[in-house]
């Protein structure tokens, strides 16, 4: 999936399942549960032992869009794409990761927490901005940021659950990420 195609698909699906655990088997089982629950965009953080192997395994399924999280630099980005990752997520803004993603035509979503970081990431070529951690004020904060920065594609991945996801989306978020809150 090319970067632009992923952005378009994510704009339709609007939700991803994100797994962070210290057990590869548990990660696979939990992701299967998320998929049974309807998720089609799935993310394995690189902190999971065997994360690249999980990406390879889940990429074999044509009904899924599989990415990696905790991508900290260009090296992680290349290894992720070599394993089959179709999008890259980071907890912080690393311009080498964003550049590598652009060179490979893979969507990047660096972690941001302030409007300044969001603008920096977007200007560096990021396709979306992961909002991490969720700020006090939640959806109202997002609405405030999107007033002067309406083109920023904000995706909160912390503090989102089945009870408030619609509030985040109504505030203008491009999508939301569920970090093991549902499964």
Task: Give residue ranges: language-model regions.
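Conserved N-terminal beta1-alpha1 strand-loop-helix module at the mouth
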Residues: 1-86, 103, 151-154, 162-163
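Glycine-rich phosphate-binding active-site loops on the catalytic face of alpha/beta enzymes
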Residues: 87-97, 130-139, 171-183
């Amino acid at each position: 999936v090319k970067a632009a195609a992923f952005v378009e698909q994510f704009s339709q699906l609007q939700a991803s399942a994100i797994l962070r655990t210290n057990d590869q088997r548990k990660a696979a089982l939990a992701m299967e549960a998320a998929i049974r629950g309807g998720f089609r965009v799935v993310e394995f953080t690189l902190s999971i032992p065997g994360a690249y192997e999980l990406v390879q395994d889940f990429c074999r399924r044509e009904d899924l869009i599989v990415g990696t999280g905790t991508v900290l630099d260009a090296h992680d980005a290349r290894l992720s794409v070599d394993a089959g990752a179709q999008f890259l997520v980071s907890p912080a803004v690393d311009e080498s990761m964003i550049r590598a993603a652009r060179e490979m035509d893979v969507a990047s979503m660096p972690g941001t927490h302030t409007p300044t970081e969001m603008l920096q990431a977007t200007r560096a070529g990021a396709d979306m901005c992961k909002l991490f951690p969720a700020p006090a004020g939640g959806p109202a904060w997002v609405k405030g940021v999107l007033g002067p920065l309406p083109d920023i594609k904000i995706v909160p991945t912390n503090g989102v659950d089945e009870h408030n996801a619609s509030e985040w989306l109504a505030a203008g978020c491009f999508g939301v990420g569920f970090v093991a809150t549902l499964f």
